[in-house]
């Protein structure tokens, strides 16, 4: 089993939601208006100097095949995102 976190700019939420539906993922926990800064990326703090927020979705996978589909879909979405800072990030951990 694996636990995945996907972090992305809030403006990409519709694309991410549609992608999850397309691959059959209808289970997750979501945090909205998440503030933060990634390695070599712009901060998203919801204020004037650092506008915008992130959204984070946590998804537990019993089957790694579904996680692999998600990874493929995120890579597909990232291929059309223009700014490196705006790419979707996926982090995965073992889950017991």
Model-derived segments and spans:
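Positively charged, small/polar-rich N-terminal and surface patches that mediate targeting and assembly
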Residues: 1-96
């Amino acid at each position: 089993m694996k636990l995945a976190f996907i972090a992305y700019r809030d403006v990409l939420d519709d694309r991410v939601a549609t992608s999850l539906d397309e691959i059959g993922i209808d289970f997750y926990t979501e945090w909205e208006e998440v503030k933060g800064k990634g390695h070599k990326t712009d901060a998203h703090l919801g204020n004037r100097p650092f506008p915008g927020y992130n959204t984070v979705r946590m998804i537990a996978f019993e089957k790694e095949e579904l996680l692999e589909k998600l990874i493929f879909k995120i890579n597909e979405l990232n291929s059309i995102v223009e700014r490196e800072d705006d790419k979707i990030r996926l982090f995965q951990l073992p889950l017991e």
